[in-house]
């Protein structure tokens, strides 16, 4: 059954590019990282590493790629974005607040009376398209959205973690998306190469490794694969634009990131800071690094 959308007469902006270029994105990324670190320190800790690795991906998507309108967060013709790695919600909140989806203070994050819960809630936070956090489910939901929106115009973007890609549901969904030829579905994998409990050792490698041959695996499931550096703004923009080219199959961007990017303390100990707190001295040093 094809869904018919009512034309509201309003236009969804093509993107929110202010013309500042890569230097402008770098400046905003630093400010977003300060927001993330300050918010997590205020509540006594949280997912520093994965939030800092994914924020550049979200920044380029929202500022240079997504067709969305913060003034009309439920516009039927908007692009959809699902942060499947919902434990990095603080990064999404920081980005949405900067886009003016809401003005609730980030300091309320994960507190009892705040709408900014530890994982995104689509019923409470403007701009959140799916309540995520149970790893492995986001792509399945994205497929449903892409099927409903096929031929209408909007694109569906799903942000996965590379650790999350060990969930079997991801690959069941990947197989279905390819079979349905969903070229309005785009996956971005935050390949920061670390997860909370480490990677399961493979028979060929004595040391823990991520899902081996990630690009080959996605190709084997029928996806178009793009690989890029996850903190190179021009490279990310090029990859996201390439993903929009109709090919009759879904596209995945494997973005090579650094867990804790921008904060040397976290980058040096990514396992510790998957979900952790920092003391006052460490926090002061982090804020100095991000000054």
Give, region by region, the residue ranges found by the protein language model.
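N-terminal capping segment at the start of a domain
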Residues: 29-45, 190
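Glycine/aspartate-rich loop-and-adjacent alpha/beta segment that forms the canonical ThDP
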Residues: 2-5, 233, 239-291
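N-terminal hydrophobic or amphipathic helices/low-complexity stretches enriched
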Residues: 1-32
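Cofactor-binding active-site loop characterized by glycine-rich and histidine/acidic residues
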Residues: 36-39, 51-179
């Amino acid at each position: 059954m094809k869904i018919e959308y009512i034309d509201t007469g309003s236009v969804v902006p093509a993107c929110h590019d202010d013309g500042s270029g890569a230097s402008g994105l770098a400046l905003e990324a630093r400010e977003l990282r300060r927001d993330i670190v300050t918010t997590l320190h205020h509540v006594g800790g949280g997912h520093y590493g994965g939030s800092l690795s994914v924020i550049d991906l979200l920044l380029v998507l929202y500022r240079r790629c997504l067709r969305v309108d913060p003034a009309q967060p439920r516009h039927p013709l908007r692009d959809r974005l699902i942060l499947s790695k919902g434990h990095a919600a603080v990064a999404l909140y920081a980005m949405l607040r900067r886009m003016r989806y809401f003005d609730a203070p980030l300091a309320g994050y994960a507190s009892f009376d705040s709408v900014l819960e530890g994982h995104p809630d689509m019923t409470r936070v403007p701009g959140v398209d799916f309540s995520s956090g149970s790893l492995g489910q986001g792509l399945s939901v994205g497929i449903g959205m892409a099927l409903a929106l096929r031929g209408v115009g909007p694109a569906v973007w799903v942000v996965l973690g590379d650790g999350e890609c060990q969930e079997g549901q991801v690959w069941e969904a990947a197989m279905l998306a390819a079979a349905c030829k969903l070229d309005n579905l785009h996956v971005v994998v935050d390949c920061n190469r670390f997860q909370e409990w480490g990677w399961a050792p493979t028979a060929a490698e004595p040391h823990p490794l991520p899902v081996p041959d990630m690009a080959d695996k996605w190709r084997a499931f029928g996806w178009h694969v793009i690989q890029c550096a996850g903190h190179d703004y021009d490279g990310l923009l090029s990859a996201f634009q390439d993903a929009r080219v109709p090919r009759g199959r879904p596209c995945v961007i494997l973005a090579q990131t650094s867990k804790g990017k921008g904060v040397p303390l976290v980058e040096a100990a990514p396992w510790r800071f998957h979900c952790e707190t920092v003391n006052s001295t460490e926090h002061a040093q982090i804020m100095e690094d991000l000054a």
